[in-house]
Design a protein with these regions (language model features):
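Histidine-acidic metal/acid-base catalytic patches
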Residues: 1-109
Length: 109
């Protein structure tokens, strides 16, 4: 599993790591975050430090054609915090965002 935000929070340059590891990536955690490895916060997928459309283009350009899962979604208004990071409304928001980017990236190819 390649958790892009984890690599980023460790200080890695994703735009160098993904091409280097492309043939070893079997599953992507599509996740965004902000901060540092010792003081970070989960963000909405469209509101962190990572350029999510650019990352999807990079996966495509490197031949990474694997399952992608939205991961660590923020809890949205009206949700309980029973399953923090994996609640339904935040996940639906993230899936819609991912789907929109994927459609755009596919049209560019």
């Amino acid at each position: 599993t390649f958790c892009q935000a984890t690599y980023y929070m460790m200080g890695e340059d994703l735009y160098k790591v993904i091409p280097r590891l492309a043939d070893k990536i079997m599953f992507v955690h599509f996740r965004n975050a902000a901060g540092t490895k010792v003081d970070f916060r989960e963000t909405f997928h469209d509101n962190g430090e990572l350029d999510m459309p650019r990352l999807l283009r990079l996966y495509r350009d490197c031949g990474v054609d694997v399952p992608i899962r939205v991961d660590h979604v923020p809890t949205m208004a009206g949700e309980t915090v029973r399953n923090a990071g994996y609640d339904a409304l935040g996940r639906l928001y993230a899936l819609g965002y991912l789907r929109g980017i994927m459609e755009t990236v596919d049209k560019e190819a």
